């Protein structure tokens, strides 16, 4: 019935899988950004800014390259992709940020 009207059905399992994959990519890249912040010696708001910029950069790359600009095909509400899980990668980021900062700058 939905296909007759030209509307693609939304399958909940597919949307949940897409969210899981995006969450995995963001968590993995947040660790890499944490390593970069630690090696660069960023502290305080500079490190926080790198996390936020990195989060949105990775989100934009996923949106542009993998989704080809068609967000509604993979997610129901559009805002959820951009800001809903911004804090999920923060623990990984902070852990690797402090680890690499202490490894590089321990003798200063």
From Swiss-Prot:
Topology versus the membrane: Multi-pass membrane protein
Transmembrane residue ranges: 21-41, 45-65, 86-106
GO CC annotation: EMC complex; endoplasmic reticulum
Places the protein is found: Endoplasmic reticulum membrane
Protein name: ER membrane protein complex subunit 6
UniProt xrefs under PANTHER family: ER MEMBRANE PROTEIN COMPLEX SUBUNIT 6
Keyword Transmembrane helix (UniProt): yes
Record GO biological process: autophagosome assembly; protein insertion into ER membrane
Xref: Pfam families: EMC6
Keywords, alphabetical: Endoplasmic reticulum, Membrane, Transmembrane, Transmembrane helix
Membership in a protein family: Belongs to the EMC6 family.
